[in-house]
């Protein structure tokens, strides 16, 4: 499948990912974006077949305002964004695609558990990254103490985090800046955005030692940019 990761911080940290391929509405396209997206998929498949690629992976492209696609790199492994692709994937009409399991299966020399013809997508997935950077200070990395971190559970929501939910957490100076990934599913882009904002509104984040304001700034940044998501 495809996903769009155009909304990033100045440090090139991806902040919002959308599947299938979408784009910020602030970009005014003068080309057929659906055609370009189809071409990108066709090019990627052709390259994979040409070199005999047999693994999970991501072909990363950048598209100019004229609609010219350029291949940037191939990540020959699973990526942290795999969850937003998996949440919209359906195999034989059923949910439950596990891309990490497929990565292991191919590494063992086993065939994939399904064929391309058996794969379809349903709905829209949005992934938010809560990152230890301060959007109000040029996305400068920050450390501090998180006193409380919680949200309202929902059947359309998955939150992955290493931050403890039952006791405070001190962000160290040597750390993975990704504090949490939130994956939201909706039947269409409008529902996905509505649910995404509902999740952000439900977040309870309290911090001390400088962590409080950056935490709130992160949520405000994600809220502001949720409105910029628009399907090709």
In which residue ranges do the predicted regions lie?
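ATP-dependent carboxylate activation and anion-phosphoryl transfer catalytic cores
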Residues: 1-232
């Amino acid at each position: 499948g495809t996903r769009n990761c155009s909304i990033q911080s100045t440090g090139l940290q991806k902040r919002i990912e959308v599947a299938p391929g979408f784009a910020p509405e602030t970009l005014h396209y003068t080309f057929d974006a659906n055609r370009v997206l189809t071409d990108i998929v066709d090019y990627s498949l052709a390259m994979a077949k040409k070199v005999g690629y047999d693994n999970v992976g991501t072909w990363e492209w950048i598209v100019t305002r004229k609609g010219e696609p350029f291949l940037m790199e191939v990540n020959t492994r699973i990526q942290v964004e795999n969850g937003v692709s998996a949440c919209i994937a359906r195999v034989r009409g059923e949910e439950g695609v596990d891309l990490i399991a497929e990565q292991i299966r191919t590494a063992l020399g086993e065939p994939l558990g399904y064929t391309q013809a058996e794969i379809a997508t349903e709905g829209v997935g949005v992934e938010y990254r809560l990152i230890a950077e301060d959007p109000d200070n040029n996305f400068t990395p920050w450390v501090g103490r998180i006193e409380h971190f919680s949200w309202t559970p929902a059947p359309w929501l998955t939150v992955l985090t290493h931050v403890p939910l039952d006791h405070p957490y001190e962000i160290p100076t040597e750390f993975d800046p990704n504090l949490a990934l939130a994956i939201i599913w909706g039947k269409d882009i409008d529902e996905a955005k509505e649910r995404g904002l509902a999740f952000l509104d439900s977040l309870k984040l309290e911090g001390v030692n400088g962590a409080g304001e950056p935490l709130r700034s992160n949520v405000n940044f994600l809220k502001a940019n949720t409105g910029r998501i628009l399907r090709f």
